[in-house]
């Protein structure tokens, strides 16, 4: 692949070695060298960025993956963007495969919509274009006042299923909760496979979070001002039904699909349930493998046979701890997106056959 126009500068942030490795793969596909930038922390833990080449009038692309120190990662990105802005870059595009704080995209209790705050900070710093993959909620695109390209990793995961699971025709796609049923349905329809949904105690805690602010109860009667007929009815509390699997998984390979694997307890519980229902092999596939805390150990000790994630987030240490974790490289689609944006070409090819629910 060759970039036909000059004036492209590709920078890698310094959050971790995997970020640099991903940036090198993208640069190699584009036929360019990584830009020279120095990112480091002062003894007082402040982040300092020094752009070591001219970016005046050029299209700058900054690649940043999310490390365990997510807040430092964000500050690195913001300072790099602002440094390029003050150095008179023509455009500044952020390539952030996993958008941090994406789970905090809804109002919960007396909290805040942190995704909206972070999007505003990126735009304020000087970002003119945002490239990411599989946002946790598509509505996050509306938090930005700049163009957003939400690329999809599902073609790479579908290809992995076809090439690495020899008897995938005997598989069934599984949603571990009703909230992930649309994604599972998309996989099932594209692979011409059956669909199963787990409902009950294995549901995500996120989908069941109470949105009450825990204010004191309303006083029913204040003198004669409130009539008994005006009492406001309250929502009944939820009760999860006994765990059930809607769909036949007996004697089949079960492929659980989701967008993020973080705390794996729900995936382990889903795998145990599927084994009890007769599935003889369990795969878990997701775009973003955060794999926090004890995830590698829990996966290794579970009935899950293989966990497949992309390299949107570094997880080399987790792979050493758990051989069941496999990685799919998505640098190809990121490099093609960069090439098209830089050359002013249409991005529609990268979204071909992608529906509203994908």
Curated annotation (Swiss-Prot):
Q: Which UniProt keywords apply?
A: Nucleotide biosynthesis
InterPro entries linked: Pribosyltran_N, PRTase-like, Rib-P_diPkinase
Does the keyword NAD feature in the UniProt annotation?
no
Q: Which SMART domains match?
A: Pribosyltran_N
GO MF terms here are: magnesium ion binding
SUPFAM superfamilies to which the protein is assigned, alphabetical: PRTase-like (SSF53271)
Sorted alphabetically, which Gene3D superfamilies does this protein's record hold? 3.40.50.2020
Specify the superkingdom: Eukaryota
Give the GO terms filed under biological process for this record: nucleotide biosynthetic process
Q: What does this protein do, in the record's words? A: Seems to play a negative regulatory role in 5-phosphoribose 1-diphosphate synthesis.
Return the similarity comment: Belongs to the ribose-phosphate pyrophosphokinase family.
Q: What is this protein called?
A: Phosphoribosyl pyrophosphate synthase-associated protein 2
Organism encoding this protein: Xenopus tropicalis
Gene name, per UniProt, is prpsap2
């Amino acid at each position: 692949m060759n970039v036909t126009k000059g004036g492209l500068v590709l920078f890698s942030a310094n959050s971790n070695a995997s970020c640099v490795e991903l940036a090198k793969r993208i640069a190699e596909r584009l036929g360019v060298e990584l830009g020279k930038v120095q990112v480091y922390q002062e003894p007082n833990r402040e982040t300092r960025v020094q752009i070591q080449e001219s970016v005046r009038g050029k299209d700058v692309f900054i690649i940043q993956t999310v490390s365990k120190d997510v807040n430092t990662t964000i500050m690195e990105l913001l300072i790099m963007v602002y440094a390029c802005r003050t150095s008179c870059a023509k455009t500044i595009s952020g390539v952030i495969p996993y958008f941090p704080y994406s789970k905090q995209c809804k109002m919960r209790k007396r909290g805040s919509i942190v995704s909206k705050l972070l999007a505003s900070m990126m735009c304020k710093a000087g970002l003119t274009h945002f490239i990411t993959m599989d946002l946790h909620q598509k509505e996050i695109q509306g938090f930005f006042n700049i163009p957003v390209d939400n690329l999809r990793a599902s073609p790479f995961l579908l290809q992995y299923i076809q090439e690495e699971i020899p008897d995938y025709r005997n598989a069934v796609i599984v949603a571990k909760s009703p909230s992930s049923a649309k994604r599972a349905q998309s996989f099932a329809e594209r692979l011409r496979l059956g669909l199963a949904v787990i409902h009950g105690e294995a549901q995500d805690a996120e989908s069941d979070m109470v949105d009450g602010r825990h204010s004191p109860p309303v006083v029913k009667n204040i003198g004669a001002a409130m009539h008994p007929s005006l009492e406001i009815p309250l929502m009944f509390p939820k009760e999860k039904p006994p765990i059930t699997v809607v769909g036949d998984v007996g004697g089949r390979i079960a492929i659980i699909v989701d967008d993020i694997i973080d705390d794996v307890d729900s995936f382990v519980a889903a795998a145990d349930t599927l084994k009890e229902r007769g599935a003889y092999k369990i795969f878990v596939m997701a775009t973003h493998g955060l794999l926090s805390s004890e995830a590698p150990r829990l996966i290794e000790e579970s009935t899950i046979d293989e966990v497949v994630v992309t390299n949107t987030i570094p997880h080399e240490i987790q792979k050493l701890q758990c051989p069941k974790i496999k990685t799919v490289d998505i640098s190809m689609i990121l490099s093609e997106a960069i090439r098209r944006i830089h050359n002013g070409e249409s991005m529609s090819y990268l979204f071909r056959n992608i529906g509203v629910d994908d």
